Amino acid sequence: MIEPASGDTDPLTIDDAARAWVERMRDTMSIEEKVGQLFVFSTSQDSREELAPLPALKPGGINRFPKPDLAAFRDATMFAIESSNVPPIFTGDIEGGTISYPFATAVPNIMGLAACDDLATTEAVARLVARESRVLGYDWSFGPVVDINSAFRSAIVGTRSFGSDPDRVLAQASVYARVLQEEGVAACLKHWPGDGFDERDQHLVTSVNPLSVEEWHELYGRIYGSLIRAGVMTVMSAHIAFPAYIRARMPDAGREAFQPASVSRLLNEELLRGELGFKGLIISDATGMGGLTSWMERSEAVPALIENGCDMFLFSRVPEQDYRLMIDGLRKGLLSEARLEEAITRILSLKARLGLHLREPVERLAPLEQMRAGLQQSADVRKANAASGQSITLVKDVQDLLPLDPIRHRRIVAVMEEGFSFWDGALGRGYDPIIGELTQRGFEVRSYDPDNMPTREDTDLVLYLVGQEATPSAAHIYLDFVKLHGTNRKAMTQFAQEIPTALISFGQPYYLFDAPHMKTSINAYSSIESVQRETARRLVGEAPFTGVSPVDAFCGLEQLKW
């Protein structure tokens, strides 16, 4: 357990013995070893072969995207621990939903938690996530997301956020971050200086926070400031511009006003550290993103990230190349020795704050069967199932369709679009769980056939099941009727006036924008199995809808309400 900070306490404060370890390690490292510590490299294959080249670079951290084989995951992680003379920190995008780790308890995503509208539920889920993360060897969660989902068309914020209400975002994130750190997992606020007002995705372009400085302080400044005072350990500096702040300091700024925060000294050092008082560690967002790669040449970007305020460098397409570019940047003066020393001190202090320097490998990663015993415990599964049910939100039912009845609505045509995940170890996205639950209750469910479209004579209900959660590089998320119905011409056919029709989103909560004619709409936020099963129970009236929408599912349009 990490003791909570208070007031303006440095979240990386450590005792004298830990400080002596930090100073000894820092002062005995070569320049090459210090440069290696700046990097958090990404792995996704759970193999020693994938990890084998990394020890030579001596990275400070390793991000783990696991595959479903727990034994292989453990073996690869232990190999990384045993191959490092400085304990590596293990990181992960631990956000729930369909990117819940395959051998851990699947939990609702962040927006699903917000829809529960119950901080006790958020605390319970965050605690089980943190405990399972520790079982798996994770030390640092890249979360919670504290973006405000103002732009409903944003394909990258949406279900990764706590919603559009800044007060709700702050309340939920405060609980989530506190619990992570109580359980020994460093929390990370993202995406600095704040996403959610631009419809675009920083994975593809340098997106923009368009707020005035005054508006920003009322919203993001309040959120970050409160969580910094509460002792959050780390912040992720994103490839997002904040031109109003830059121009307040540089009135004549042209292109420079749209510089990504990740390489902006003004945003990282003056605003985050100077004005908000953050004393923890700043890590860049993933450096392969278009928001950075479209801004500057790689040889300049690599040292610029550290020189301009980031303490760690996240992900590399070619680790050896970026390592060499960092060394070259130091030799050419693009990265100062002072910034390198400052960054290394914070990196080692974070590791010491988490107690990594005190743990033997077996203390960081238990034997395989002990790991299995610590995952998907029955009490945790019950908590996750309860949260899944609590989150499901009835947006509208103006046709009084619900509850479904196996006599009146026996013949169901399911029109399905599963969506995709950004890594191949994510949970499956099919709809077998909800279809199975309906079938068990006496319904006959058949898949939509574009060559045999449903009619009044053969169909009692058309049920749209869509499920794209907010996802990197998706660009736009919408109801693609061409894909759903099979052809451009058939996309124009809508069934709602002829056959009872309902829309269930197991992803983004804004699909009504593309289908205002849907008279029954449900938002379930993610397609994990427990959410699907709990949705089926609510469809037939076995449990009430209790979810409270964290966003305006009507997208500000009165037309969508009817």
Locate the predicted segments by residue:
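Active-site-proximal loop/turn and secondary-structure-junction residues that shape catalytic pockets
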Residues: P68, G96, V146-D147, P193-D195, ...
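Second-shell residues forming the walls of enzyme active-site clefts
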Residues: A72-S83, T98, S164-R339, R346
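Short amphipathic alpha-helices and their capping/turn segments at secondary-structure boundaries
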Residues: R74-V86, E123, R127-G137, Q172-E182, ...
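Short, conserved phosphate-binding/catalytic loop or strand-edge motifs used
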Residues: V146-I156, D322
